[in-house]
């Protein structure tokens, strides 16, 4: 028989930098999970990733206080900031432009994010990426 799921926990953890300090420690500790077990497993799975890349993770918590976790791709804003070579988006996205991304960069980001997006075609994924870019104050060129 399958284990009984008691809850889910969503966190965004830097790759290779999971440690028991806040926010990870308290979030897992409140639910009675082994914090160090998660940290070691997460850091082992994110060794290939670039250091400090934010990795969204969904932790499934079971009744016997065991857990499994699924890692997602980094947030779209992370990829867009890398592509535009900026530190942060525009403070006033409708008026001020923070930078530019090309259609080729948008396609590349859409291909990376495809498995986490709720769409079927690369074109619809590109539209989602373009929308995120505009909301950050980035201009989509080409």
From Swiss-Prot:
GO terms for biological process: translation. GO terms for molecular function: large ribosomal subunit rRNA binding; structural constituent of ribosome. PROSITE patterns: RIBOSOMAL_L11. Keywords: Methylation, Ribonucleoprotein, Ribosomal protein, RNA-binding, rRNA-binding. InterPro entries: Ribosomal_uL11, Ribosomal_uL11_bac-typ, Ribosomal_uL11_C, Ribosomal_uL11_C_sf, Ribosomal_uL11_CS, Ribosomal_uL11_N, Ribosomal_uL11_N_sf. Pfam families: Ribosomal_L11, Ribosomal_L11_N. GO terms for cellular component: cytosolic large ribosomal subunit. The keyword RNA-binding applies. SMART domains: RL11. One or more lysine residues are methylated. The keyword Phosphoprotein does not apply. Forms part of the ribosomal stalk which helps the ribosome interact with GTP-bound translation factors. Part of the ribosomal stalk of the 50S ribosomal subunit. Interacts with L10 and the large rRNA to form the base of the stalk. L10 forms an elongated spine to which L12 dimers bind in a sequential fashion forming a multimeric L10(L12)X complex. Belongs to the universal ribosomal protein uL11 family. NCBIfam families: L11_bact. This is Large ribosomal subunit protein uL11. It comes from Bradyrhizobium sp. (strain BTAi1 / ATCC BAA-1182).
